[in-house]
């Protein structure tokens, strides 16, 4: 019989219970025991929920207090020496790796000051992982039995799960060599494999019939030495337990060949993103191996088209027989919200198009029953699904003729600034009169509880528009005054009116819908609530002009208008799956183009259009990069190019490895770009010299509560000046300050500005 399988389930809880419990522990409000009890309760609830929805194969070890890759590092004793601090509990050591730690000395404890580990996007998703750090000295050993413990937890509750492990080749491929080490992480495979052997043995002996082992890098362009490692790894591991080798997010292409002949129990492929994967996998599948077919998207919130999915499942069954077929999510469903329940505010016509995590589990059960018992056994469900898909395709919400007509009139000239950078920057300097090493922030300032509560009260109609506007003006005034007092050169209004840098704009454009509780994990305890693009997008009215114009009216210093750029709005939303991403990006860009011109007319001479998601939007295969970058860059330029020469366009990029796309960033033709740099050990410095416009490499990590001293800021400036012309260098944090508290924000900025003043004296 065909079985249904989920590759991973959202861990944060229906109401973000994990986030709340974790942050309460960090702030000292609750104990470690209370945090771990909440985590255990969530795991049990999620296992039972999946079982109740009819899922046959339920995952374990997909849960994490912070990040599953960091869990593996912790379990394998891959803990950099700087985090092995005396007096820290195992749990606090774990969190120090993810967040960094700064603690003053006490009578019985030494001072602690360690930065967080490097955080990287998980493939092209919006989830972030902590990059493993290895060296010749790494002593791999099974230092935590988390995977076993959680399997036994579920077993005790009467649920036999399929434990999830990140495969050894993927783990080492995404790792980096520690500072001072010249080793290629993959060279450590012989040292790491015995740890996997030990863990797989323990899981098998405990009763795990199958183990899911994730090797998603097989959807990337891989060097031969990595491909060759699969034989070494799985000739060993495949003989220890029954492994389902899992791939997702893209096409296997020729990488599928390395799977042929491996002693594994089966292979999982994502056929949502790459339908050709089924044929690729079937071609290399062994005589008794299982094929797991990922037909239900783990990345998007649209209902599965049962007619299309059933055809794929039937093809797999006809090829290998029903006993060897699993119907699965395409990837972990970590990337989508928990449940549609409670989302009563969504237009019912639109809501019927969606399926969140719980609903995806039910979809898997329906498709599996159809495969086992025939379509007649679920006729009502199949007919309802077909009706929903048809209604969406034919709905006037999805297609707006005026938007399509405007798109048809876009010309190449609309993507070009009036003059080259050198001409523009001279005019901007004459107008703005900024000092050497101008200081600024990325946009947002700390959002206090009072701000969040007031915004929520306004949304619920508990205060009037006038009361809310007065509150926002007061917050803006306070932030502007603070920036003037600490000595920043280019100010921002602080964004107190904005809940999220994407949602805020989506709420002011047509074509989006929003959830009340549609949270997904971004990193650690950070959760986001992505908008959903359901139809053609356009801007009906100005979105940010009122706040920016007010902020500029109360200061003589330049005020930045703050916008989110097209690709980031697209990538950080759940996009449509019925039109190409480039169509959606251009629609968003046209709305932003109108906003940029309105800001300029309102007297805003510096306009920042943040594009942090540009890099993560790159296709996984390099052969597809040029096409993507062409339309992505066109969208940014369409949004920003209409301004006058003396209006300065800024942009911001974060969470990215820019070496691959630095030329593309240059082609955006922004006047100033700020980039996240602090978490990458300043490794971007080597490419900064190639950039010909102004640049602001991030000087401190806003994701960590640690406050660098003035001397550290100055050292960073000195290092950057060796690569960037001093009159092109801006000084700024590496990201917005929204999630930070005021004490560390104040300390960070004061230290940064003090270092800027020292640098001006030295380099003037």
Curated annotation (Swiss-Prot):
Gene3D superfamilies linked: 3.20.20.210
Pathway(s): Amino-acid biosynthesis; L-methionine biosynthesis via de novo pathway; L-methionine from L-homocysteine (MetE route): step 1/1
Binding locations of Zn(2+): 652, 654, 676, 735
Residues annotated as the enzyme's active site: 703
Entry binding sites for L-homocysteine: 442-444, 495, 610
GO BP: L-methionine biosynthetic process from L-homoserine via O-acetyl-L-homoserine; methionine biosynthetic process; methylation
Phosphoserine carried by residues: 182
Location(s) in or outside the cell: Nucleus; Cytoplasm
Annotated positions of the Phosphothreonine modification: 441
Phenotype on disruption: Leads to methionine and adenine auxotrophy.
Family matches, as Pfam families: Meth_synt_1, Meth_synt_2
Alphabetic keyword roster: Amino-acid biosynthesis, Cytoplasm, Metal-binding, Methionine biosynthesis, Methyltransferase, Nucleus, Phosphoprotein, Transferase, Zinc
Catalytic activity: 5-methyltetrahydropteroyltri-L-glutamate + L-homocysteine = tetrahydropteroyltri-L-glutamate + L-methionine
Binding site for L-methionine: 442-444, 495, 610
InterPro entries named in the record: Cbl-indep_Met_Synth_N, Cobalamin-indep_Met_synthase, Met_Synth_C/arc, UROD/MetE-like_sf
GO MF assignments: 5-methyltetrahydropteroyltriglutamate-homocysteine S-methyltransferase activity; zinc ion binding
Top-level taxon of the source organism: Eukaryota
Function: Catalyzes the transfer of a methyl group from 5-methyltetrahydrofolate to homocysteine resulting in methionine formation.
Record's protein name: Probable 5-methyltetrahydropteroyltriglutamate--homocysteine methyltransferase
Species whose genome carries this gene: Schizosaccharomyces pombe (strain 972 / ATCC 24843) (Fission yeast)
Chain's gene name: met26
